[in-house]
Amino acid sequence: MRDRVKALLVVILALQSAGICGQFIPKDYSHKEMKAAKNWVDSTYNHLSMDERLGQLFIIALYTNKGEEHIEEVRKVVKNEKIGGLILMQDDARREIELLNEFQSEAKVRLLVGMDAEWGLFQRIKTAYKLPWAITLGAIQDKRLLYEMSAQIAADAKKVGVHWDFAPVVDVNTNPKNPIIGNRSFGSDVGNVSQSALHYSKGLQEQNILAAIKHFPGHGDTDVDSHLDLPLVSHSTKRLNEVELAPFKALINKGIGGVMVAHLYVPALEKRVGIPASVSYDIVTRLLKKKLGYKGLIITDALNMGAVAKRYKAGELDAMAFKAGNDIMLFSQGVAEGKRLIRKAIEAGEIPQKRLEESVKKILLTKYYLGLNKEYTPLSAENIDRELSSPAHKALAQKLYSAALTLIKNDEHLLPLRKNETYYYLPLEEAPHQTFADELAKENTIVVIKNEKEIAGIPRNSKLIVGLHKDNSTAYKPYKISDKSKARLLNLAEHHQIILNVFGSPYALKDIDITPISTVLVSYENNDDSMVATAQSMQGKQPINGRIPVLVNDTITYGMGMSLD
């Protein structure tokens, strides 16, 4: 046994000395497999031309909803530029599988295929099943459930040919006005974000799907969407180390395969004015690679985003990102020009030849670990839509929403609901609500209030369930409650026993005085599964154990919540 461990260490050290030690290693990998990986990487690298080596650094986007002209353009880039991978965007699963079968069968080195699937493949494939957002997961106390969810995402990813889920988000969301992170963050507490992300990442990687923690060095306290322009993170180095960088530092030695670098301007880390983190040598190489010691794949955020695309030319941007220390340029808009400029910089001695070898061998090693060294077996698209949206997905989603449900107040002990009592139900705000009413009505007498006249007819001191149903059709919809709904809620609280359900972000309560409200629940999202899970928990069929994952205001703080069995 001792000799076997010693031999394995020798191989690992050999990989490190060759500059190809990625952070991700499949579970229970043997000495023999590690040695085979090194041999394959060396052999493959040596058989690639300079142009093919450069191609491995690039991932471009594939949309199946943009028509054949776009697909033909992707086909040309894949064939002519010998790129390293694809990111799947808004996709039809069947067409996407057909195209991957074509591209993978023809590739000299198989493509590394990624996707943003933070809440499952639904994020890109609308026939897939929607699983909860990170803010919902952050409320769950049993983090093993997050592993269960990401393991399901991994199983789904394999069915459509995806090897890399660009998730989880480890940004600490300390800014309620953040327009792009918000629901995508596990919350405002460093420890909770780190633990949630670790379980999520393990669920992916233990099924051999790569994870990527993002958005380094921390996108949580911004009020600009980097898809549109360059956000500023103006905190001191001390604050950055304590908050923004803390989850990355906690996770960097946990074997996570990728780190995605954001398009952010962080003056405390980059002294040159207006330079995004993604093209900053100080941030990518000096901080992430050298100071923090990260050895896995480093990938840029999408290079078509306004934060960088408005500032730099396509191709030039790719070369800058590579010089900064990134291994992979994601969503490249100028592969041929990027390759030309990187090659020119290598020939001029601006970038060491060894640097290219390091990145390409890291990419190849990851491909080997993910099984991309093997001959491609075409995927089947038959029944794919049904497989991505099954009864098992529904059961998992409802279990997760039930575990996240958070009871902030229950002053009059109105929960659980009593079967022999009548409850009035008033839906407020813009989103659907009927599923919630229908589920409640299975066990209770529910009178749905539909207009002003019916509100006036509610007997005084009635038990009134008020649902704040926010539009959750995307993760980026506003969470704020209208002044009209807030005024109506507080007026009703003067005359009735209120059970308030927030089917949306807990930040919706930021400007609401909950003092006169008897009972307050947060369900985090407004969809059929969250409504069913909430109704069943209110009826006592499931326990309530969630905790608020963000600091909302002085009254509603991180970790707030009570259990109800």
Sequence positions of predicted segments:
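Bacterial Sec-dependent N-terminal signal peptides
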Residues: 1-27
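Preference for extracellular/luminal or secreted protein segments
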Residues: 22-60, 64-76, 290, 314-565
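Second-shell residues forming the walls of enzyme active-site clefts
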Residues: 49, 70, 86, 94-111, ...
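Short glycine-enriched loops at secondary-structure junctions
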Residues: 63-66, 115-123, 163-173, 213-219, ...
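Catalytic domains of carbohydrate-active enzymes, especially glycoside hydrolases
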Residues: 73-89, 151-164
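Short acidic, glycine-rich surface-loop motifs adjacent to enzyme active sites
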Residues: 75-91, 176-177, 252-275, 463-475
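A substrate-binding/cap region within the structured catalytic cores of diverse enzymes
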Residues: 140-162, 169-190, 197, 201, ...
